[in-house]
Swiss-Prot record:
This is Putative activator of 90 kDa heat shock protein ATPase homolog 2. The lineage of its organism: Eukaryota, Metazoa, Chordata, Craniata, Vertebrata. PANTHER family: ACTIVATOR OF 90 KDA HEAT SHOCK PROTEIN ATPASE HOMOLOG 2-RELATED, HEAT SHOCK PROTEIN 90 HSP90 CO-CHAPERONE AHA-1. Belongs to the AHA1 family. It comes from Homo sapiens. GO terms for biological process: protein folding.
């Protein structure tokens, strides 16, 4: 069992500066943000839709905000991505020859939604052109979602070249990580594979909490001191959740004046949102603060 500040080094973390493979635990993480932006330009700009009434084309990648990363741990790949994308489109109504242009927005491309459920909104500048707008909204949206699906395939194949890929032997075992703060312990156990659970609607949970300690010490509570004090991405589940249902949790550690701000983002079932807020606040954050009051800053 691990005490606070002596956690298991197997958590997925952003990067070790010395590149050491801790305890021969084969993990790595790659930033796919810049590569993703190039892929969006390649896949989305140039999309054309056409029918007897008009022709539309996505001609500009106006804005891309967000990040993406690929993590590998013990032969398992985990992907984290969150994007807000804005595209410019133009078109022409064939009968009148009138040209129109507008905007396509994808406000939340992330693990929270499947590609087919990802919101794609379309707008058009003032003027008549309902036929063209309808064309872009139907056929155009379908092609945009198809391109987003191609991006996710690339994220999981092209962007992972050189990383440790799952092997047939490793695929027979799932690693279940359970965080138990009540006893200030961390348990890691392997379990046999079971059938995949049914897909359930999810929601993004955002929380921020201030702790009267340094980034280094707060970070060490979730992992080990020798790892970079910045960000942790991990799969997490409650013991009473259905098998194979996990939440993806991202923890960012931001230094403030005399304190550390912990920014938490978690994708989980919609019906679990309020319970998880209570769980993080009461069973995790408050216990950590209580532990910090008994622990000197220098450890």
């Amino acid at each position: 069992m691990a005490k606070w500040g002596q956690g298991n080094p197997h958590w997925i973390v952003e990067e070790r500066e010395d590149g050491t493979n801790v305890n021969n635990w084969r993990w790595t993480e790659r930033d796919a943000t810049s590569l993703s932006k190039g892929k969006f330009q390649e896949l989305l700009v140039g999309i054309v839709v056409e029918n007897d009434a008009g022709r539309g084309e996505i001609n500009e990648l106006k804005q891309v905000e967000g990040e993406a990363s690929c993590s590998s741990r013990k032969g398992k790949l985990i992907f984290f991505y969150e994007w807000n994308i804005k595209l410019g489109w133009k078109g022409i109504v064939k009968e009148s020859g009138v040209k129109h242009k507008g905007l396509i927005e994808i406000p939340n491309l992330s693990e929270e939604n499947e590609v087919d459920d990802t919101e794609v909104s379309l707008s058009k500048k003032k003027g008549d052109g309902v036929i063209l707008k309808d064309l872009m909204k139907t056929a155009g949206t379908a092609k945009v979602r198809e391109a987003l699906g191609d991006y996710l395939k690339a994220l999981k194949t092209e962007f992972t070249t050189g990383m440790i890929l799952p092997t047939k032997a490793m695929a027979t075992q799932e690693l279940t990580v359970k965080r138990k703060l009540s006893g200030n312990t961390l348990q890691v156990q392997a379990s046999s594979p079971v059938a995949l659970g049914v897909r359930i609607p999810t929601v993004a949970l955002h929380m921020m909490e201030l702790f009267d300690t340094t980034v280094e010490q707060l970070y060490s509570i979730f992992t080990v001191k020798e790892l970079t004090n910045k960000k942790i991405i991990m799969k997490w589940r409650c013991g009473n959740w259905p098998e194979e249902h996990y939440a993806m949790v991202a923890l960012n550690f931001v230094p403030t004046l005399g304190q550390t701000e912990l920014q938490l983002k978690e994708f989980l079932s919609i019906c679990k949102e309020e319970n998880m807020k209570f769980c993080w606040q009461k069973q995790h954050f408050e216990e950590i603060k209580g532990s910090l009051q008994l622990t000197p800053l220098n450890g």
